[in-house]
Curated annotation (Swiss-Prot):
Binding site for Zn(2+) 1: 153, 156, 210, 213
Annotated cofactor note: Binds 2 Zn(2+) ions per monomer.
Job description of the protein: Participates actively in the response to hyperosmotic and heat shock by preventing the aggregation of stress-denatured proteins and by disaggregating proteins, also in an autonomous, DnaK-independent fashion. Unfolded proteins bind initially to DnaJ; upon interaction with the DnaJ-bound protein, DnaK hydrolyzes its bound ATP, resulting in the formation of a stable complex. GrpE releases ADP from DnaK; ATP binding to DnaK triggers the release of the substrate protein, thus completing the reaction cycle.
Residue stretches of each CXXCXGXG motif repeat: 153-160, 170-177, 196-203, 210-217
Listed name of the protein: Chaperone protein DnaJ
Gene: dnaJ
J domain span: 6-70
Gene Ontology terms: cellular component: cytoplasm
Description of what induces expression: By heat shock as well as salt or ethanol stress.
Amino acid sequence: MAEKRDYYDVLGVGRDASDDEIKKAYRKLSKKYHPDINKAPDAEAKFKEVTEAYEALSDPQKRAAYDQYGHAGMNGGFGGGAGAGQGFGGFGGGAEGFGGFDDIFSSFFGGGARQQPNGPRQGSDLQYRMDLKFEEAVFGKETKISYSREAECHTCHGSGAKPGTSAETCHKCHGAGQIQVERQTPLGRMMSRETCDVCGGTGKEIKSKCDTCHGTGREEERHTVKVKVPAGVEDGQQMRLQGQGEAGSNGGPYGDLFIVFRVAPSDEFERDGAQIFVEVPISFVQAALGDEIEVNTVHGPVKLKIPAGTQTNTVFRLRGKGAPKLHGTGNGDQKVTVNVVTPKSLNSKQRDALKAFAVASGDSVNPQDNNLFDKILNKKHKK
């Protein structure tokens, strides 16, 4: 048996290809090699190869398994892939390692009788990146998104057959969806069951294929869905929209859509969960004497009292002025760090006042009145 080609090479895309790039490559190649269009002897084999590659790389879990294990990750030999988690937090881990004795024989002999290839199959999951401004992530928003997906064919309603006709029982597997195959194994010649290569495991054979989908039962559509972004989401978090992925097969349900949030940084604030951080400059006079200053928060400006004698890098807490708690109630806090700023230049009155302050404090200081540039000028004037 010829060695399988790399799925990325089959589709002609790089390993860092986006979902849209993979889908475009598949559409182009599937049309090129579709047996109803291309009559070349190897067209059907290439069409199946392209379809197999797309089914693996268009599914986030299957693609992750393939990237890690190669073709071995596609036959169940490395345990379960990551299962899609509900709500937030990404894809939950679901790997369980090797299964029982039946799983070992399944990997040797093509799946065994436990598989139901002609049963309903859920459609592939999709991933969508949503870019949010800092404030949108804090307060949430409602919006609509549009994306391409494989949907049930509107002409044949997923049957793959021309309207007025129906699929017939497969002549090769007689409706079982599987065929018996004899092969040589380390234990000798064994009989195994594999998915029927004529009907693809459906048990049905389409003689008169739908003109719209060419018998696949699916077509590409531009799908629009409303999304309610919860207040308090963070960069990298995911939200699942059930049933908004691609169409299933054999009457199976649609897959899910995973929205990945990418939050732009703020020029003023930093954030860690529900806590928001900001730095505010104050003068050394404000720090020494105390003051009431205005501080910006995501909820609007508020007043903050600065006690007399405040030191630089002192942190103040504004309770309830942070971001909403995503998995709780109420808001977090905003922490304000004050930085005492030393003036870079003083006029004569300010300088005299500081000298008087130094004398009153008993400090012995040697003021550096002139900078290097001033000293050079003074030397020139003296000459």
